[in-house]
Amino acid sequence: PDGMPPSEAMEALCESAAGAGGHAYQSYVGLPEVRKAFADWYARWYGVTLDPAKEIQPLVGSKEAILLISLAFLDKGDKVLVPDPGYPTYSSASKLVEAEILTYDLCEDKGWWPDFDALEEMDLSGVKIMWTNYPNMPTGAAASEELYAKLVDFGRRHGIMICNDNPYSFILNDDPLSILAQPGAKDCCLELNSLSKAHNMAGWRIGMVAADADVISEILKVKSQMDSGMFKPLQLAAVQALSQDPEWFAELNAEYRRRRVL
């Protein structure tokens, strides 16, 4: 993203940074205001109800969650399903914790979706995590209710945690979807999200993970040993960014559509 963030976010950042109390250590779990803003955002755009106190963890960008999740839920020798093609960090983080990587192909003739028949034929013993990323990078393939329902069913039947990386859901898309909107998804799924793409705030490093409270608790055990909380002015800026009206996304996507034609 090379556009400007929402003006309200920049104003909130500057106001908080100039005031007293904005430069101290912050809580690992994030401000109540930012957790509520993420919960409201999910309810408004994805139709997903989340407990802001227990089912949301703000992050220094969603990328850090890939390593946090790997450290929290993988032991040496555990297996991880990683898409090919896919975001390299899924494999890199798995290697750091000495997990065994099992790649699954995303093919054009399947719409760049997983081939569930092929997955069922794999030896899935010892598989703890499956990384998914829709809308997909690098293929651009979109998600659908059908795809997410299949992923939830696959994860529940095989005892695999489906980790859906969802930072592109607003880009060139008027109907953002979340895997957590599927019935029973919290039993086996978590989702990463971010302000980087949808709000032109990539350098600000503001993201989140949403999941069942027990999953969030395990992630927090690792995160609390890796940083000392997010800068308060950034969190207050995120609250403003997350409250943007549909016009913000319409203008953002109009610009991307204009560039795509060129």
Residue ranges and their predicted role:
Residues 4-7, 188-262:
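PLP-dependent aminotransferase class I/II
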Residues 1-61, 68, 241-244:
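N-terminal small-domain helix-loop-helix segment of the aminotransferase-like
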Residues 49-56, 76-79, 126, 186-189:
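Short acidic capping loops at alpha-helix termini that bridge into adjacent secondary structure
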Residues 96-102:
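A short helix-loop-beta submotif of the ANL/AMP-binding
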